[in-house]
C-alpha cells in the first residue's frame, strides 16, 4: 500500500520517518527550503539528529502524491481546507483513504477536520490518527500508543495493519467525533496548565486543573454528538486521557510551553510576541477561539476554555484568568 503524507512539519516528518523504515512514503511540502533541506541532508531542521530514510521521497508538487492508496494529512487544521481543495482540484481518486493527523477546529466554520474533508472530498473514506505522541519521540522510534478511528470496520482494520509498527500500540475505534474533540481540546487545556505552572501555583493546582478539564471535554463531546452519549473508552483511552496527560505535563508540549511563558511573565506579556518566538504552530491558540464560539453555539458552559480565550483574545488579566483556572 503506497502512502503519501501531506505536511512536512515536525509531526508529518516524524510519521514519514516511522513508516519509512519499512515502506515507501511520499512526503509533500510546499516549502522549498524544507524540500531542499530534506533532500540534501536527509534530515529535517525540526527534528535534528533524526535521519529520514531513503524510502521517503519528498515532493513539492501536490500532483506527485495523488496516486498513493492512503493519504495522511498532517497540516495545521486552519490550513486543511486549502489542502483538501488542492487535492480536489487534482482529481484525487475516490478510493484513496484519507487519514487525518491534525488536531483542532476550523475557526471560520467551527468544523472538525473530518467535517472539512467530507465537505470537499465527500467520496473519500476518512480515518483519524490521534493520541499521545511527541514528534521527536516518534522520529526516534520510542514506544507510543495511538488510536485509529474509522467508521468503516473493514477499512479501519486494514489501516491499523498498515500503520502498525513494532514500537506502536495502535488501538481501533469507531468514535471519530469523540477522538477529534479530545484531540482539539487538550491543546487549550495545555495552555491553561502552562499558565498555572508558569505562575508558580504548584502541582496540586496543576493536577486539579487537569481533572476539571475532563469535565469540559465530556460536556463538548456530549453536545457535539447530540444525543448526550459519550464513549467511556474514548475518554479513558490514549486519544483523550493519554493525550491530555502528556500535553498538559511536559514542556516538550508547544502549547504548555506557550502558556508557561505567559504565566511566567513578571512584567506583563505580549501574546503575539510569544507566538512569533516559536518555530511551530501553537494549535491551541486558534482552537481556543473555535472552542469559545462552538460552546456558545451549542449553549454549554466551558469556564476553563472561556478563561483562556479571554486572556488570549480579549486581554483579560493573568489574575482574572487564574481565579477561574484554580477555582
Curated annotation (Swiss-Prot):
It is found in: Cytoplasm. Pathway: Membrane lipid metabolism; glycerophospholipid metabolism. GO terms for biological process: carbohydrate metabolic process; glycerol-3-phosphate biosynthetic process; glycerol-3-phosphate catabolic process; glycerophospholipid metabolic process; phospholipid biosynthetic process. Keywords: Cytoplasm, Lipid biosynthesis, Lipid metabolism, NAD, NADP, Nucleotide-binding, Oxidoreductase, Phospholipid biosynthesis, Phospholipid metabolism. It catalyses: sn-glycerol 3-phosphate + NAD(+) = dihydroxyacetone phosphate + NADH + H(+); sn-glycerol 3-phosphate + NADP(+) = dihydroxyacetone phosphate + NADPH + H(+). InterPro entries: 6-PGluconate_DH-like_C_sf, 6PGD_dom2, G3P_DH_NAD-dep, G3P_DH_NAD-dep_C, G3P_DH_NAD-dep_N, NAD(P)-bd_dom_sf. This is Glycerol-3-phosphate dehydrogenase [NAD(P)+]. It comes from Wolbachia pipientis wMel. The lineage of its organism: Bacteria, Pseudomonadati, Pseudomonadota, Alphaproteobacteria, Rickettsiales.
